[in-house]
Amino acid sequence: MPLRRLSIQWKITLLAGLCLLAIVALLVATSLTQAHRSAALVNQANTAMLEDSARQRLQAHAETQALRIQRYFMDAYQYGNGFARLVQVLKDRGGSDLRAELTRQARASLAGNPDVIGLYLVFQPNALDQQDSHYLGQDAMGSNESGRFSLYWSQPSPGTLELEAMPETMLGDTSIGSNGAAKNRWLTCPQDTARTCMLEPYLDEVNGRQVLMTSIALPLLEHGKVVGVVGLDIGLANLQQLSVNGRRDLFDGQGQVSIATAAGLLAGNSRDDSVLGKPMDKSVADGLLRVAHPFTPIPDTAPWQVVLELPESVLQAPAVALNQRLDAHNQNANLTSLLIGLGTAIAGLLLVWLTARGVTRPILAVAARLEDIASGEGDLTRRLDYAHQDELGQLTGWFNRFLDKLQPVIAQVKGSLQEARNTADQSAAIASQTSDGMQQQHREIEQVATAANEMSATALDVAHNASQAAQAARAADQASQEGLQLVDSTRQGIDRLAAGMNTAMDEARALEDRSGQIGSVLEVIRTIAEQTNLLALNAAIEAARAGEAGRGFAVVADEVRGLAQRTQVSVEEIRQVIEGLQQGTQDVVGAMHAGQRQAQDSAARMEQALPALQRIGEAVAVISDMNLQIASAAEEQSAVAEEVNRNVAGIRDVTESLAGQADESARISQALNRLANQQQALMEQFRV
């Protein structure tokens, strides 16, 4: 191996350097991993924090826009509410010029508020002064064709006012307008709900152009009942301008501001004013963030919404820029860590190399001393000198003690080599004599091995014959057991047969009794037939005496007598059959008695045969056990003979081996003699 060929200095340097590099690499990798994780956590936290800050900024901007819009509507609401109170005061005061006063006050109020497009005041029929019939068609008094007060002042442009009395057709127009509600919703909503209503934005023509507007309608209540409606039309162009201005303030105009009504219609859109009055698209495009802030334009109305939309890329731009700066800083820090780790590893390798050199320098000095001893003709009187008490000092000390022990041993070996040479000569002579004795012993063991083989063959024959006899005895034992089972089964069958014959005898006796009963019945029938015959004969005689009058009766009497005679004949035949049946039954009963006695005798003989068969089985089992013992003994004798044969063969092999070893011992003795001479020459090289 290349590693084995390296010096200790390089091995220490290499292994320690690898460990140092592994530790430095592990520390640097751990530092880089932790830095990467920290950077990821910081990036995630920064992104979340900046996104949250941006969302809060969007929410705050939406609240600001909502407050501006709410203030715009609240100004109009306060204006309408104030005018409604004025109308209520004027109505309560009354007077013949009430309609003219209301018309003048409405004009003055509208002229003072140029942002309002129109102001209207509508009373229920005869709800103002109970004089609608006196003002038919008087538009200047705000009365329509039915005399109903339905005043409408419009302001197409600031300072330009136009008076109109709304006709009944307009007040009752329920057709659907552009905002999806009835055109007279401005009137019916406060009447039906008795609450302030704000209509969905709708388009109306003002000075020849379509203007998006809405209406705020307030009910006039009297004793809890709606008697009229005050309303004002507000243009929503200011809302569009608010949305455009809000977009400029939203991330340098990169977002979008929309104002949506309660029904989802657009009242303002900073991107496209052509969609005003149309439903807002509720779907959000990918990569776009939408924030909606609800607000109530005026009290007691459905909430509107200020909807802000901003691309997520714009929202995340500060976080992305910060993350990029952090990534650049982390890369520089990682590069610095790598350079520091590399410099540390190089410095550590240099220190390890110097340390290894300091450790191996004394070892090289000791090796040089050992080389000097080895090359100095085996002088065992020289010793190593090393003054330090470190591991190398222990090595030199123990080596000197080893030489202290080795020097007298070598001296003794040199003195005993001559004695070893003489002993080797004597060993050669003894080995030759041992070889001759081994040859004689080998011939005698050959004869013993032949006799052991013959005895082993005889023992095998005996074991084989005994095994066959044991098998035959086992077969006989099995046959006797089967015979015993058959005899027992036969005995049980005979017992069942005897029981069946007893039952049959009882039934035969019962049959014989029933046959006797049948004979008695037949005897009664025969007697009845004889009496019937006599009665029929007497009847025939009486009929003959009667002449023609008894001829029919004579015919019947003849028929009855014939039937009685046939009955007697049939009864006689049945009696003969019954007597034959009774005789057969008696014969069967006698045969059954004989069979029963024979079955009982057979069962008794079977009972006697069972013990004999059991004794035969026991004797056969004893014979089988003895044969098995004989076979086992013969097998053991054969095994012993085989063992003796193997032992004799082993002794023969050992004898042959000993003979060969004796010859080999003689040769070894001669070789020992030569080796002793060589060792003597070698020992002469050491100086003790």
From Swiss-Prot:
It comes from the Bacteria. The chain crosses the membrane at residues 12-32, 335-355. Residues 416-652 form the Methyl-accepting transducer domain. It is found in: Cell membrane. It is a multi-pass membrane protein. The keyword DNA-binding does not apply. Disruption phenotype: Mutant shows increased biofilm formation as compared to the wild type. Mutation decreases plant root colonization. GO terms for cellular component: plasma membrane. Pfam families: HAMP, MCP-like_PDC_1, MCPsignal. Putrescine binds at Y202, L203, D204, D233. Coiled coil: none annotated. One of its GO terms (biological process) is chemotaxis. Residues 357-411 form the HAMP domain. PROSITE patterns: CHEMOTAXIS_TRANSDUC_2, HAMP. Keywords: Cell membrane, Chemotaxis, Membrane, Methylation, Transducer, Transmembrane, Transmembrane helix. Disulfide bonds: none annotated. Belongs to the methyl-accepting chemotaxis (MCP) protein family. PANTHER family: METHYL-ACCEPTING CHEMOTAXIS PROTEIN MCPB (PTHR32089), METHYL-ACCEPTING CHEMOTAXIS PROTEIN TLPQ (PTHR32089:SF120). Chemotactic-signal transducers respond to changes in the concentration of attractants and repellents in the environment, transduce a signal from the outside to the inside of the cell, and facilitate sensory adaptation through the variation of the level of methylation. McpU is a chemoreceptor that binds and mediates chemotaxis to polyamines such as putrescine, spermidine, cadaverine and agmatine. Also binds histamine and ethylenediamine with much lower affinities. This is Methyl-accepting chemotaxis protein McpU. It comes from Pseudomonas putida (strain ATCC 47054 / DSM 6125 / CFBP 8728 / NCIMB 11950 / KT2440). The gene is mcpU.
